[in-house]
Amino acid sequence: FERPNIAQMQGYTSGEQPQDGSSIKLNTNENPYPPSPAVAEALATFASEQLRIYPQPDARALRQAIAEHHGVSIDCVVVTHAGDEALRLAVTTFVPPGGVVASTEPTYSLYPVLTQIQGARMVSQDLAADWSLPADFAETVNRAGAQLTCVVNPHAPSGQFTAISRLEALTKALQGVLLIDEAYADFVTTEGA
């Protein structure tokens, strides 16, 4: 009963997940350290009876706090259960079946999976020799007719950081939507991040 593009898919295989307890798993963005004492203190005062009920379906209080922190309208804030859900939402929102998603190679391995689920086509361009975005990236993406272009910044696995000015130029040059995946942004100390 499933759609033909789903029936032809291979299962998604995540990266290595060492369970030895001594590895720091940066590929899953996990923190190897315990929470700060301030977090532990805040959790101790948390009303645990709230754990038995569902949160606000629209996450209004959280969205409002995020909007105020970033100086934007609450309508500009979408809260998801995790980053992968946000990526899925972007693909299903911006890319029609038969459409095109673009990225670089290498990139996050979930992009092609989400693209295939959507019944779309993935177009990738190799990074430049120094792991930066190729100079003709926007031209290649536009020629492919991409509705959504995904750029990981900082790039995984290289750690290459794309300057904000380069990303701003890319937004102006692209004919589709630019998604900047900042899953590892908290690890950047580069100025302009």
Cite the ranges covered by each PLM segment.
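Hydrophobic/aromatic ligand-binding patch that stacks against planar heteroaromatic rings
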Residues: 114-115, 170
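N-terminal "arm"/small-domain region of PLP-dependent enzymes with the aminotransferase-like
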Residues: 1-53, 145-148
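Conserved PLP-anchoring active-site segment centered on the Schiff-base-forming lysine
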Residues: 93-114, 128
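Short glycine-rich anion-binding loops that position phosphate/pyrophosphate groups of nucleotides
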Residues: 29-32, 83-84, 108, 153-157, ...
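Glycine/Thr-rich phosphate-binding loops of Rossmann-like dinucleotide-binding domains
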Residues: 34-36, 87-88, 111-112, 158-159, ...
